[in-house]
Amino acid sequence: MIQGTASDAGKTTLVAGLCRLLARQGLKVAPFKPQNMALNSAVTEDGGEIGRAQALQAAACGLKPHTDFNPILLKPGSDTRAQVIVHGKALTSLEASAFFGPEGKGYKAIAIEAVLESYNRLKQSFDYLLVEGAGSPAEINLRENDIANMGFAEAVDCPVILVADIDKGGVFAQLVGTLALLSESEQARIKGFVINRFRGDINLLQPGLDWLEAHTGKPVLGVVPYLHNLLLDAEDALVPYQQAGADSGARFRVRVLVYPRTSNHTDFDPLRLHPGVDFDYLDIQHASPDALQGADLVILPGSKNVRADLECLKTKGFDCALRKHVRYGGKLVGICGGYQMLGIEIDDPDGVEDTPGSSDALEFLPLITELEGSKVLANVSGELSLGEEAVAVKGYEIHCGRTTVLGQLSRPLFLVDDTGNPASDRGCISDDGAIFGCYLHGIFDTPAALDAVLAWAGYRGAARGTSLEEHREQQLERLADTLAEHLDMARLNSLF
């Protein structure tokens, strides 16, 4: 099991790389994360939902995503409330107090049953399981009935490797401090340390490594270098090194708005990778609406709390900036929650995402959305119609809203839909062709669809060519090669 001294220490990446290394050896290996809290998710083959990071790790193993890889997924809708997804299905939304409960006796106390059920099924099907912890095992206030870190490791008698991010500074305090806050049995469970994202001369670090091993009695199993431009599916929130695309000098500007509860920002990885695109995220809580000036394409992403994020967007003045953007010839796209925002009205009569009520939307498209408790989870393929010829497109849907298009569409966005539902349920385009929205996450992953959207938005450069899947494979191979070089694989293999 890989645990970390903090969030974003490198647990997801380390598990993915080790999964690929074991899979290369022809071993049957699978990823496992008992509990994940994230707004980036993926749809499984059987119509369930898991964390995006576990879908990435499954790909590293050569597997399709499965709900057992992430039995508990928490999707925050506010600072204190989250949707609880068990074995791929949304069961309820709970306040934090109800999840943890008084003296640790809330829902969390029984969630371990679902976790162990998935773990035992996987154990029967695979030779090796690589388990990822969550956050830090040393969160004192979360120790009671823990299912994400040491609580799980102790329940299944699993050895633990502790990883820390040296790039943030204070790596020795992170490791020694975490160890000091664990019980004796938990300390004994940690078999070694991995230091992640190191830049510089390893010889200058060596005295610190020698001290760490002498002080703790535990080996340093490797120092992983900082991998520049490693772009793999992010687990959750954007961090600074993920936010902008590569500086290619491109002049075609794409801007994606980021609201407080943005979800599935991995949709935009293909745009960040595109050499002809000047890509950036704009955090609406801190950026000025004037930052949209000069943008060729603006995208509204998904949201876990659409009405609250819409209100934030309006309060910060981005509604007026979007109208100005379109008025002066810019193109506008909404994905999932962003699609709902482009409509006329969003109704939440039962309080699915937040307080029951109704919100006026941005009125760019003739849509009305009603949020419902039942969630749509589907892998979808079809044809996207933006230019003279339709192009193949595939992706996935994750949403609670049912959107109705008012009137007859003069231009359907999707020509073919393989779910048996009307194509208009997937998305629509404005009569003037300047704005479109859809429920399809991953719409940019297919090179032909990405090229079609960029051409529609006015891009006249070269086509992309490489799919996100091909790029992901290249990055996983690069990651695995790096781990093979910089980790003590003999010691690691002895733990399996």
From Swiss-Prot:
Pathway(s): Cofactor biosynthesis; adenosylcobalamin biosynthesis
Biological role: Catalyzes amidations at positions B, D, E, and G on adenosylcobyrinic A,C-diamide. NH(2) groups are provided by glutamine, and one molecule of ATP is hydrogenolyzed for each amidation.
Keywords: Cobalamin biosynthesis, Glutamine amidotransferase
Homology family: Belongs to the CobB/CobQ family. CobQ subfamily.
Protein name: Cobyric acid synthase
Pfam families found in the cross-reference section: CbiA (PF01656), GATase_3 (PF07685)
InterPro entries: Class_I_gatase-like, CobQ/CobB/MinD/ParA_Nub-bd_dom, CobQ_GATase1, CobQ_N, CobQ_synth, GATase_3, P-loop_NTPase
Recorded superkingdom: Bacteria
